[in-house]
Amino acid sequence: QGSGRIKLNDGRLVRLGYAGQNGHDYKSIGPYFKEYNATGINSALDMIEWLHRNPQDSRKIIERNQSYVFFRTINGDGPIGAQGISLIPERSIAIDKAIYPYGTPIWIDTSLPKTRNYIERKYRRLFIAQDTGGAIKGAIRGDIFFGHGKRGEELACYMNNKGKQYALFPKSVKIPNYYRTH
């Protein structure tokens, strides 16, 4: 997660934005939960909760991923995407910047996942490519910014549904060869 909000012990809310990465490739910690006989790990939210319930083992698992992200405090409503502007819940999407330029409109046709509190349902809408991330590689991967709060966290943690995406280019733009062959 490249940015977000944290609540300090004194109750203040601080916004954080991406400031850099240590250069190591991202490695999912998901497979390591089996070594600790963790059951029922089906989403990122399940992983987070297990790590909180098992502090004696959490550091050992987290350190398996040598990729670290550094943050800075930011002003405004945040979070700020890689494009340099505030992300809009359920309208901003993170993409592979080597394939899609920031600002590209992308139509998404997928479904929202079944979660603890929501049923699976169709989800179709227009997004704008405004962010990127270390795990987003290729034309068929995108991460929707669902916003803050319990709903946003739950949807983001469970979302792994397949779907279709359509990059929308004006007629006047010469479409790169990559898009013609994929």
Report the location of each language-model feature:
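Solvent-exposed, well-ordered loop and adjacent helix/strand elements within mature globular domains
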Residues: 1-182
